UniProtKB/Swiss-Prot annotation:
It is an enzyme of class 2 (transferase). The keyword S-adenosyl-L-methionine applies. The gene is cbiD. It comes from Pseudomonas aeruginosa (strain ATCC 15692 / DSM 22644 / CIP 104116 / JCM 14847 / LMG 12228 / 1C / PRS 101 / PAO1). Its EC number is 2.1.1.195. SUPFAM superfamilies: CbiD-like (SSF111342). Belongs to the CbiD family. Pathway: Cofactor biosynthesis; adenosylcobalamin biosynthesis; cob(II)yrinate a,c-diamide from sirohydrochlorin (anaerobic route): step 6/10. This is Cobalt-precorrin-5B C(1)-methyltransferase.
Length: 366
């Protein structure tokens, strides 16, 4: 039998970012090179001052340097890198400072628009700062005046990266080493939202003036059929419509097309920025009210309120010639317009489960 769910569920467990893993392994390897001993754990300080002890899978001599590895623990967050082996390979160099390299499974930046220059390893700024700070402190403690060559790798990272937005962002060959706080908050989805922002920034930096933000593969396909947009212009927003709309305040484009399943667009029309079922639900009475404004009969309104799904309510409305899909898109456009700068032309499209267009609303610009 299935076990009953406890009335008071246990609190979700936080984890550590790939940036924290890279810092811990870099420090352990560098310490070994500067006369330290092989250890099975290392303590690091996170950006906000928390001290954490991270377990090592190995710490050993490697070629003319040293390497250390740790398993990424994302806590209870559904992170693609959870359980992956993150490792650092460190060599000493005569020149002071730290020079970063992409080890196996870590990507390289190939397009402008990110916080890293083209050609740089995809080790983000905060993880770089963490590693630099820890290695500088170690060098001072050991009286070492030279520098470090640091290569960060992730076992299986090239394959894992295909499940992320890295290929579309132009980060090729592997994963990015991420993190701003050093801690992964369960279901905070901060990495996903950051990748949405990066996608917009990369599109802008590469001269793209029209982007299409889509909730999934079917809506992306619909936008491909409608427009000859390059892949870089397709932004996989998932449930995070707010991440797109708010980012355009500081990083506007000429035109934004929003496309998603009818249910998702219905939530946006109802004033929700997070379209996931955990945070928003479809308001069937609201849909019935919009249908009423289009002349829907009382019987139709009642059947829509009793519908099992938004798709069923849509089918009922369309069967009576009520253009509910267009109305929902118009309400979604009106809500989005209140967030997005007026310089950005807006349009909204809704599709059914087969990917067919069932509604649209486009602004007329003079």
């Amino acid at each position: 039998m299935r076990e009953e769910t406890p009335e008071q569920p246990a609190p979700l467990r936080s984890g550590y970012t790939t940036g924290s893993c890279a810092t811990a392994t870099s420090l352990a390897a560098a310490r070994l090179l500067l006369g330290g001993t092989i250890s099975d754990a290392v303590q690091i300080v996170l950006p906000k001052g928390q001290q954490v002890l991270m377990r090592l899978e190995f710490c050993r001599a490697w070629e003319n340097g040293a390497e250390a590895g740790t398993l990424k623990d994302a806590g209870d967050d559904p992170d693609v890198t959870h359980g992956a082996l993150v490792f650092a390979r460190v060599r000493l160099s005569a020149e002071p400072g730290v020079r970063f390299h992409a080890g196996p499974g870590v990507g390289t930046v190939t397009r402008p628009g990110l916080t890293l220059a083209v050609g740089e390893p995809a080790i983000n700024p905060v993880p770089r700062q963490m590693i630099e700070r820890h290695l500088a402190q170690l060098a001072a403690e050991r009286g070492y005046a030279g520098g470090f060559e640091v290569a960060i790798g992730v076992e299986g990272g090239a394959e894992l990266a295909l499940k992320t937005m890295n290929p579309r962002l132009g980060i090729l060959g592997g994963l990015s080493i991420l993190g701003t706080s050093g801690i992964v908050r369960p279901f905070s989805c901060s990495a996903y939202i950051a990748s949405i922002h990066q996608g917009i920034d990369v599109a802008r930096a590469n001269g793209v003036r029209h982007i299409a933000a889509c909730t999934g593969n079917a809506s992306e396909d619909a936008m491909r059929r409608r427009y000859a947009l390059p892949e870089i212009a397709l932004i996989e927003m998932g449930d995070f419509a707010g991440a797109v709309l708010k980012h355009l305040r500081r990083a506007p484009v000429e035109k934004l097309s929003l496309c998603g399943g009818f249910g998702k667009i219905s939530k946006l029309a109802g004033g929700h920025l997070d379209l996931h079922s955990r945070h928003s639900s479809i308001d069937l009475p609201q849909l019935a009210g919009w249908a009423a404004a289009l002349g829907a009969s009382t019987a139709l309104q009642d059947s829509m309120r009793a519908a099992n799904t938004s798709q069923q309510a849509l089918a009922q409305a369309h069967a009576e010639g009520v253009a509910l899909g267009d109305a929902v898109c118009a309400h979604a456009l009106r809500f989005a317009r209140g967030i997005v700068p007026t310089e950005v032309a807006l349009e909204v499209f809704a599709i059914d489960r087969q990917g067919n267009l069932v509604g649209q609303a486009c602004e007329e610009r003079r």
